[in-house]
């Protein structure tokens, strides 16, 4: 359910795998998973566009090794040393094939780190574009994902505005990690009082509360 608070263990259980990396292409042949963060200490520059429905996700670096001590100085890889596509390459190829009309958009579940041990499920996205751009003296991958309404529905393409990351963090801290109504600490969601499918703009902290499943608004 989009906007719900979730633990790392719960994420892994839901996806039926231990999520050891941020990019996970085609898990179980039904969807992909990415882990994002907009915290000040985040290793990558993920961002939401001003329209509130679009995520620009940065690709991931080469692994740190004895040879590659500073991955931030190297181009992000499209392939591994063996020649197989790396996660960047897999997502990039899927986006290119979608743009060429050769496949449907890749369905991607997005989980966002709000603070240590606290994650939020941002819902289902469609991967619609990918490119490389210069970042100082190296090239990085960028992936464009559109948030879609309708939960996990394969065919829904209506975009839905997201609750911004900074709003979630502010609300979490303001409400003390508990339901604002009853004080429950489990099955929590960020609730702006309106159905997700009818949300027209990104909410602010003034109209978002942390609520348990029992007290959430309809369709939350």
What kind of feature is each model-predicted range?
Residues 2-120:
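Acidic, glycine-rich low-complexity segments with interspersed aromatic residues
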Residues 103-105, 122, 138-140, 185, ...:
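Eukaryote-biased feature marking scaffold/signaling PDZ-domain proteins and nuclear chromatin regulators
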Residues 113-158:
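Compact mixed alphabeta submodule
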């Amino acid at each position: 359910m989009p906007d719900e608070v979730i633990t790392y263990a719960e994420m892994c259980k839901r996806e039926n795998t231990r999520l050891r990396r941020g990019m996970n292409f085609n898990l179980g042949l039904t969807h992909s998973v990415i882990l994002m963060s907009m915290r000040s200490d985040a290793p990558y520059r993920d961002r939401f566009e001003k329209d509130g429905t679009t995520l620009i996700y940065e690709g991931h670096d080469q692994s740190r090794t004895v040879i590659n001590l500073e991955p931030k100085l190297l181009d992000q890889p499209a392939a591994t040393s063996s020649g197989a596509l790396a996660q960047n390459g897999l997502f990039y190829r899927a986006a290119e094939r979608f743009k060429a009309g050769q496949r449907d958009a890749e369905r991607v579940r997005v989980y966002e780190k709000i603070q240590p041990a606290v994650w939020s499920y941002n819902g289902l996205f469609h991967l619609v574009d990918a490119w490389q751009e210069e970042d100082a003296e190296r090239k990085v991958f960028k992936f464009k994902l559109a948030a879609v309404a309708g939960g996990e529905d394969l065919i829904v393409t209506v975009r839905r505005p997201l609750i911004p990351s900074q709003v979630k963090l502010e609300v979490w801290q303001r409400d003390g990690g508990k339901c604002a109504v009853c004080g429950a600490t489990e099955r929590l969601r960020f609730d702006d009082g309106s159905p997700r499918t009818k949300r027209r703009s990104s909410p602010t902290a003034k109209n978002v509360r942390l609520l348990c499943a029992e007290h959430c608004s309809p369709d939350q």
